[in-house]
Amino acid sequence: FKQSFLHRVELLKKIPVSQVQEIVANIKLNEQLVEFIKTYKNRSYIVTGNLDVWIDGLIEKLGMGKNVFCSKALVEDGYVQDVFNIVEKDAVIRQMVLPFVAVGDGNNDAEMIEAAEVGIGYGGVRPVAPSVLECATHVVYQEDKLVYFLNKLV
């Protein structure tokens, strides 16, 4: 993950942070998931490798406050200059109060999903990575089914 992430950042360094923020702001969100997160924001966390400067608007929109673990970047003159912290999901896991539920779709989510009491592979946007399929206790492909299941767990 680290190498591919740094390569992606290197490509996006040429684009102003404000433009990336605008793209992120226009991503269609799963409304039922947004409502779930807002309802349970004190019990929900976002753990992502994405850069803080790219997702700050999204985090604010969700009202997540400090319940976010993400990578951090140095910005100068409106452009990413350097990444000074890449989130390590396994380190985040060790900070979680047990038991916890984890939802993810990518290879970099597998350790977190495996460590969770309930690990959910969610294929709502793209196929669930094989590494997640191997360790998930559940796999869901529809937003309404995911939200229904999460509501049963809280």
Go through the PLM ranges and name each one.
Residues 1-39:
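A metal-dependent, Asp-based hydrolase signature
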Residues 25-154:
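C-terminal cap/substrate-recognition subdomain and adjoining C-terminal extension
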